[in-house]
From Swiss-Prot:
Keywords: Dioxygenase, Iron, Metal-binding, Oxidoreductase
Similarity section: Belongs to the glutarate hydroxylase family.
Associated pathway: Amino-acid degradation
EC number assigned by the record: 1.14.11.64
Name of the featured protein: Glutarate 2-hydroxylase
Presence of keyword Iron: yes
Reaction equation(s) it catalyzes: glutarate + 2-oxoglutarate + O2 = (S)-2-hydroxyglutarate + succinate + CO2
Origin organism lineage: Bacteria, Pseudomonadati, Pseudomonadota, Gammaproteobacteria, Enterobacterales
Superkingdom to which the source organism belongs: Bacteria
Gene name of the record: glaH
Length: 325
């Protein structure tokens, strides 16, 4: 199995009942599914993982898989195959996940445990140099002086893939809402590559496969530049991307103009989804054929949003990019 193996027989269409959770198509797109853990599942999970504080998950990486197994067992071992099937399915590849009863910032540690369990049923989350852990928590406020658009509230954070400036493969991205106060706007933005009307034009351009330099600002704590093309293909020849407009460094006029046009074509796509993510919920997407970003917020002096992210590789994948390793 590879990271983009075609998977048929859509689980939502089959009418199958699941133990411990429900699964429905989202209001925004049939590609994005909503998975909700029942109140009983949530309660039992939190009780069974209560002996391990988040610090234990940070220090002992095998515990991240242990809590994943606990969650899967509570779901009659139906959860892990469903997660993998959805994320590896090119026609879907995205989930909005919620646990009934987890919806307040006071439960932040419980949120980290739940997200960790889910992520480690599909693979392993990479070391995040920005935080020094396998996950990162960060806050968006009304005023920001950071060196990237990650925390800037009053502008759109453009659509991009994660992991463009590191050497580790980034198959999945998990983005969780921990807290939100005095907030209007700021929906998550998603674009599936196959819904991008300009994909064929840019994928077939001569510069699409040229290795380009990606360099991160100081806040990312990554000092080494990496080189890779914007586009690649999976084993079936379908396009995948590793792109972010902030960190790609064109070497000449030709690359700069092409990248600028590429950015404009992505940001004006009619296929972009706007997805509200309430506190306690998280998005889990296939990073190779979904781009993600964030809409702007309405200014407020006490605006606050806290997020948690994890990004990593599918443990069940053997090949990620067909031509560029």
């Amino acid at each position: 199995m590879n990271a983009l193996t075609a998977v048929h027989n859509n689980a939502v269409d089959s009418g199958q009942d699941y133990s411990g959770f429900t699964l429905i198509p989202s209001a925004q797109s049939p590609r994005l599914l909503e998975l909700t853990f029942t109140e009983q599942t949530t309660k039992q999970f939190l009780e069974q993982v209560a002996e391990w504080p988040v610090q234990a998950l940070e220090y002992k990486s095998f515990l991240r898989f242990r809590v994943g197994k606990i969650l899967d067992d509570l779901c009659a071992n139906q959860l892990q195959p469903l997660l993998l099937k959805t994320l590896l399915n090119r026609a879907e590849g995205a989930l909005l996940i919620n646990a009934v009863g987890i919806d307040d910032v006071a439960q932040a540690d419980e949120m980290v445990k739940l997200a960790t369990a889910v992520a480690h049923l599909i693979g392993r989350s990479n070391f995040d140099a920005m935080s020094g852990q396998y996950y990162a928590r960060f806050v968006v406020k009304n005023v920001d002086n950071s060196d990237s658009y990650l925390r800037q509230p009053h502008r759109v954070m453009e659509l991009h893939n994660d992991g463009t400036y590191v050497e580790e493969i980034t198959d999945y991205v998990l983005m969780m809402k921990i807290d939100e106060q005095n907030m209007q706007g700021g929906n998550s933005l998603l674009l599936h590559l196959d819904d991008w009307e300009h994909l064929d034009h840019y994928f077939r351009h001569p510069l699409a496969r040229r290795p380009m330099r990606f360099a991160a600002p100081p806040s990312k704590n990554v000092s080494k530049d990496v080189f890779h093309p914007v586009f690649d293909v999976d084993q079936q020849g379908r396009p995948v991307m590793r792109y972010i407009d902030q960190f790609v460094q064109p070497k000449d006029f030709e690359e700069g103009v092409w990248l600028s046009e590429l950015s404009g074509a992505i940001e004006t796509s009619k296929g972009i989804l706007s997805v509200p993510v309430p506190v306690g919920k998280f998005l889990l997407i296939n990073n190779l054929f979904w781009l993600h970003g964030r809409d702007r917020f309405t200014p407020h002096p006490d605006l606050r949003r806290e997020l948690m992210r994890q990004r990593g590789y599918f443990a069940y994948a053997t090949h990620h990019y067909q031509t560029h390793q």
